[in-house]
Swiss-Prot record:
GO terms for cellular component: extracellular region. This is Cruzioseptin-8. It comes from Cruziohyla calcarifer (Splendid leaf frog). Residues 1-22 form the signal peptide. One of its GO terms (biological process) is defense response. Expressed by the skin glands. Residues 25-44 are annotated as: Disordered.
Length: 75
């Protein structure tokens, strides 16, 4: 009977150890996924900032061109 208890405790202990190792690996994988998502978000934000600045510059150039045309038409 004592032998069976020892075997049962050993099996339970090894099961708990492997479960904790699996959970740790799962957390590490989730952290890596979160970091990858953060990197992709930063890239998207950078791209959108560039588009925003280009749009502003194009708008200002168009406004200046229209203003010059109006000024020339008034003269």
């Amino acid at each position: 009977m004592a032998f069976l208890k020892k075997c049962l405790f050993l099996v339970l202990f090894l099961g708990l150890v492997s479960l904790s190792i699996c959970e740790e690996e799962k957390r590490e994988e989730e952290n890596e996924e979160v970091q990858e998502d953060d990197d992709q978000s930063e890239e998207k934000r950078g791209f959108l900032d560039v588009i925003k600045h280009v749009g502003k510059a194009a708008g200002k150039a168009a406004l200046n061109a229209v203003t010059e045309m109006v000024n020339q038409g008034e003269q």
